[in-house]
Amino acid sequence: RFIVPISSWQFVRPGVCAIGGILWDAGSGRANEVADLRLAKALPGAHNGQNAAAAYAACKALGLSTEIIVQAIMNFGGLKHRLQEVDKIGNVKFYNDSKATNADASLQALKAFDKLRWIVGGEAKTDGIDPLIPYFNKITKAYLIGAASERFAKNLKDVPHQICGDMKSAVKAAFEDAKANYPNEELVVLSPACASFDQYKDFEARGDDFINEVAQISAENANDLGENVIPFTTL
């Protein structure tokens, strides 16, 4: 038994680290770049970089080659409801992070992107979204759903926000706002920071509702957006 250190914020020698979107192998004591994780679309954010570093370290310990490991990481399709890239419609990308049922989980989504349109809300946990206040500057606009809407509106204060109530209204409002900024790329991210039980049986049902609403928008806008629309596919 032996321990391989990993890190997402500093070089560890010997060890494996993912810093600034680059995966480094420092198992020999010298850090060698092995993969550009920024090109792995299913692995946004530093937390996914850390996951990739852990997977790489485990596979190297089992004797797999660097080439095989990196190929598997770069081709990884991601997990449903966990910062899942759902679709791109015109200039707007949609991400489903319905598994984020508390502020700590949504923190990873806010860290992963520079700017986003945030669909948030549901059955709030005790600390609500207070732990996310340092990252409110990343929010272009918040679209509030579920029982926590009024409470979160007060938390957001001067951050642009809209109480939408349900998923359909939130997805539609976020898309219309984002589409108006064409051709600049916009991100719409469902990362509720809440339990789902006020409106859904579980977080999977909530995420599936988001996916279905995005599919509906894709169908409705295909003719208007023409070549700018990427057809919807469920990942």
Q: For each predicted feature, which ranges?
A:
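Extended acidic/charged loop-beta regions that coordinate divalent cations
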Residues: 1-40, 75, 79-82, 86
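Short glycine-rich anion-binding loops that position phosphate/pyrophosphate groups of nucleotides
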Residues: 9, 122-125, 148, 189, ...
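Nucleotide phosphate-binding/pyrophosphate-handling subdomain across enzymes
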Residues: 36-139
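Glycine/aspartate-rich loop-and-adjacent alpha/beta segment that forms the canonical ThDP
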Residues: 193-219
